[in-house]
Every structure is written in C-alpha cells, then in structure tokens.
C-alpha cells in the first residue's frame, strides 16, 4: 500500500473510487491536498470550468428541402453537486455532446424553411440550448449557451437570393424612374 498525494485545484473536483466503487458521501473531493491509498483507491479529475465545444459544420435539409450548412458552438459546464456523473454516466461527454447537438440541430432545422432559418437565429439557438440541456442534465452537465457562428445556404440558394435582390433593386429603379417621368 502506497499513499498517493493529489493536488486538487480550486476549479476541480476529484472523483475517488475505492476498490472500484464510488461512494456518494466521500467519493467527490474538493480543492486541496488529497491522499489516496494506491492500489485500493483510484481517481478521475473533473474540471468545473465552463467549456466551449465547436460543433463542426453540419449540412441540414430544411422543411422546404433546401440544403443549408451551419457551424455553431455549445457552452457547457458541470453542475457542481452532480459532477461525478461525468465520470459515472458517460464515457466521453465531448463526443456525446457533439452527437446530440448534431441530431438536435437536424430536428430543429428540419421543421423550418430557409427564410425562417436565416431570420430566426436566436430562436434556433434557444431551441437547441433547451433541448440539449435537458439531455445533458442526466450526465451532470448544464448547457449555458448555444451560438450559431455561420449559416450558409447551398450555392444554388445563394444564387437565387442574389437574383431576387437584383430583381428587387431593378424594380425599385423602374418605379422611381416612372414616378419621375410622371411628375
């Protein structure tokens, strides 16, 4: 039996397992010097600071069957009293959050048209945050924010939008010219 000294920083907690079992009363240890008895006790560090996960660009199909690409960020942090769940309930919470966020984004975007997606960024952020927070709560995580970095329609949709804006400018110019000639 060897004593092992662990230094736990202010922003960390140490999940301690004695003979492979986590004890709710004594298993989660706070900041300071912590002595473990090896090989009977092992530990996992849990960082309590807010973390940002970049969700890679996702291709989604809107309700009106238009392709759209979205990049976004998820801000999350462990719930302090439930931090041990990050070790006990999920193997790799980063991958789990990315997978869940991708699925939730597809569901949200699939219910909207392209025009709604382009004009309602805040609503999309909030819908994803609320749904993701409900799911990650069982792992001891709190989703504090979701921020869409970029929304990019497929090239053919961008071309159609550019043609529409150009036609609108020409229409306004013709109306202005006709009003000028009438006077």
Say what each PLM segment does:
Residues 1-182:
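N-terminal hydrophobic membrane-entry segments
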